[in-house]
């Protein structure tokens, strides 16, 4: 199936300016200047932790040097296994030109709130688990199980090194309906609300009972309840049009883990 390459490229190149600052209670001596980075929306905080840790470590007491690093925004600990773009859309929904200010911590890791991903290997394991889950939903796992280890490595390294062509040379196989089918079996989907930083998953087919391709409006109807109605969806900082087809969304707007991560706005009925 022909993909809208310019859309894929636009999503891939989306970045967020982040201003990292140290926890003032952990600083020894002179307060360091903030550390600024432009980071891909598709990346994860553990992939930039080494760079940020290296900058601030000289200002942190020796007892905290080897601590498990974590980050917060305005006191809210950031989930290390969420893509950075998802975190930004949940916590900083109003787009502006100022950097997103995050605080890095070297101690007091909130184990009751965060999954500890203190190595790239652990993050890679989590990422591959998500990919396999997504493929089970789309193709009953038939595509990713037919891939070789080198293909899995190419996906991961393409993400880590931000290499569009390297990543999509393999990922395109995961983004096509299986065999002679015209759509995925189900849409890998994670749904977030502004008042809750956890996600829910719902089994959603891209095709209606009558055989028609479902749109975002159909999805919002399925997500609505008698007491509250879904009125809008956003991903990658984009407010989505209700007529957008779910199959197209999954093929073009999914994160590298192959899931659509949607921030959903609700209104009480």
Curated annotation (Swiss-Prot):
Superkingdom classification of source: Eukaryota
UniProt KW Nuclease keyword: no
Annotated localization: Cytoplasm; Preautophagosomal structure membrane
Cross-link Glycyl lysine isopeptide (Lys-Gly) (interchain with G-Cter in ATG12), sequence positions: 132
PTM comment, free text: Conjugated to Atg12, which is essential for autophagy.
Entry keyword set: Autophagy, Cytoplasm, Isopeptide bond, Membrane, Protein transport, Transport, Ubl conjugation
Topological relation to the membrane, as annotated: Peripheral membrane protein
GO cellular component terms given for this protein: Atg12-Atg5-Atg16 complex; autophagosome; cytoplasm; phagophore; phagophore assembly site membrane
Biological process according to GO: aggrephagy; autophagosome assembly; autophagy; cellular response to nitrogen starvation; cellular response to starvation; glycophagy; larval midgut cell programmed cell death; macroautophagy
Major localization listed first in the record, in broad terms: cytoplasm
Cytoplasm listed as a keyword: yes
Function: Involved in autophagic vesicle formation. Conjugation with Atg12, through a ubiquitin-like conjugating system involving Atg7 as an E1-like activating enzyme and Atg10 as an E2-like conjugating enzyme, is essential for its function. The Atg12-Atg5 conjugate acts as an E3-like enzyme which is required for lipidation of Atg8 and its association to the vesicle membranes.
Protein family (similarity comment): Belongs to the ATG5 family.
Protein name in the entry: Autophagy protein 5
Native source species: Drosophila melanogaster (Fruit fly)
């Amino acid at each position: 199936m022909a993909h809208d390459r310019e859309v894929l490229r636009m999503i891939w190149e989306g970045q967020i300016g982040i201003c990292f600052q140290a926890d003032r209670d952990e600083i020894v001596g002179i307060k360091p200047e903030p550390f600024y980075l432009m980071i891909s929306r598709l990346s994860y905080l553990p992939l930039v932790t080494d760079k940020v840790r290296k900058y601030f470590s000289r200002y942190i007491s020796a007892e905290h040097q080897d601590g498990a690093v974590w980050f917060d925004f305005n006191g809210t600990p950031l989930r290390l296994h969420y893509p950075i773009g998802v975190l930004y859309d949940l916590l900083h929904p109003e787009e502006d030109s100022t950097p997103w200010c995050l605080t890095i911590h070297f101690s007091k890791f909130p184990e009751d709130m965060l999954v500890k991903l203190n190595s790239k290997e652990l993050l890679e394991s989590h990422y591959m688990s998500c990919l396999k889950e997504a493929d089970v939903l789309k193709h009953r796992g038939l595509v990713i199980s037919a891939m070789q280890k080198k293909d899995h490595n190419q996906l991961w390294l393409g993400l880590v090194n931000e290499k569009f062509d390297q990543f999509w040379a393999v990922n395109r196989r995961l983004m096509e309906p299986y065999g002679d089918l015209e759509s995925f079996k189900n849409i890998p989907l994670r749904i977030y609300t502004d008042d809750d930083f956890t996600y829910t998953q719902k089994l959603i087919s891209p095709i209606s009972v009558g055989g028609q391709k479902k749109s975002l409006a159909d999805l919002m109807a399925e997500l609505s309840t008698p007491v509250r109605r879904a009125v809008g969806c956003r991903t990658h900082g984009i407010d989505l049009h209700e007529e957008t087809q779910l199959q197209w969304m999954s093929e073009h707007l999914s994160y590298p883990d192959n899931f659509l991560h949607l921030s959903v706005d609700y209104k009480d009925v």
